[in-house]
């Protein structure tokens, strides 16, 4: 069984054969589940400020634990 990829921007898992793989000049590999994630990454948007990303949801849980 093939390994599922994890989006480098939003953290969502997606099936192999879908999405895009981007290889940076330093050799680091980035996977994107959608063109939306890819565009937001290259525009420099912070995933912790977008409610639909896993990074935002994890940060929100950490803030709730502190209170």
UniProtKB/Swiss-Prot annotation:
Listed PANTHER family: 60S RIBOSOMAL PROTEIN L24, RIBOSOMAL PROTEIN L24
Organism domain of life: Archaea
Keywords, alphabetical: Metal-binding, Ribonucleoprotein, Ribosomal protein, RNA-binding, rRNA-binding, Zinc, Zinc-finger
InterPro entries linked: L24e/L24_sf (IPR038630), Ribosomal_eL24 (IPR056366), Ribosomal_eL24-rel_arc (IPR055345), Ribosomal_eL24-rel_N (IPR000988), Ribosomal_eL24_CS (IPR023442), TRASH_dom (IPR011017)
Function text: Binds to the 23S rRNA.
Cofactors: Zn(2+)
Binding site for Zn(2+): 7, 10, 33, 37
NCBIfam families, sorted: PRK14891.1-1
An annotated Gene Ontology molecular function: zinc ion binding
Disulfide bridges in this chain: none
Pfam families cross-referenced by the UniProt entry: Ribosomal_L24e
Gene responsible for this protein: rpl24e
Gene Ontology biological process: translation
Zinc-finger ranges (C4-type): 7-37
Keyword Magnesium found: no
GO cellular component: a single term: ribosome
Record note on quaternary structure: Part of the 50S ribosomal subunit. Forms a cluster with proteins L3 and L14.
Tagged with keyword Manganese: no
Protein name per UniProt: Large ribosomal subunit protein eL24
Record-linked HAMAP family: Ribosomal_eL24
Cofactor: binding details: Binds 1 zinc ion per subunit.
Family, as annotated: Belongs to the eukaryotic ribosomal protein eL24 family.
UniProt-listed SMART domains: TRASH
